[in-house]
């Protein structure tokens, strides 16, 4: 009920800011509002506390709704940057592997509990192979991490979303594991500590914030900066690595696409392929990424003499 009340409050705020009078229409759409009667009823009751609204169902949804709406327009909307119809045969850029749907296998929502577990286990089976294919690049970074730590330098992990959380996780595990101070391996996430628990949309799209957050720690030639971006294109990470290069720090990119847009001294491109839930890189991509971070921190600490 708390989440339904929160959604109702947000709906009421939007209606007020749009200047809508009582009796405005609220179209019920989405998994919870359509398939969870108790949630939908709680939402209606909570919204009624703020204002009077008409609750409607959608005659059309998704692409069909957008197409039908577009046909009613007689001019290009001011906010539209491009308005065109593609000719037959037009080719569009391919989605990155992590965003595609697997070529074979059942849809996740068609399976029962045992089927979901079996499918996810089978899909994760290739994760180790994806990491093994990058063994030489990982070993190079482990050696560099060892030299940096032995010389008194620091390792920085920087990323957004799941990638940022994995970096912060690995960094936070180093003090209790190796007996080092928290400033030897530092995790930085777009949006700060709040983003560890709550999604902050838009922060990952600001390269200047990546540079700013890294600059706050005065990273320099004696440090190692590891950018983490499953897509290989996160602007926040690109900005951080650009700042690191300008400061003279060696840079590493850990990604899950074959041709990342971000440049780094060493690129670890993990071929994890499509996720069982398309686009959800907290799954296979996240598993492979954490394996690499484990190797960098554990291997680096070992070479620097913290394991005996």
Name these PLM-found stretches.
Residues 80-108:
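N-terminal amphipathic/basic leader segments beginning at the initiator methionine
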Residues 1-2, 110-111, 118:
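A mobile "lid/hinge" subdomain adjacent to the ATP/sugar-phosphate binding pocket shared
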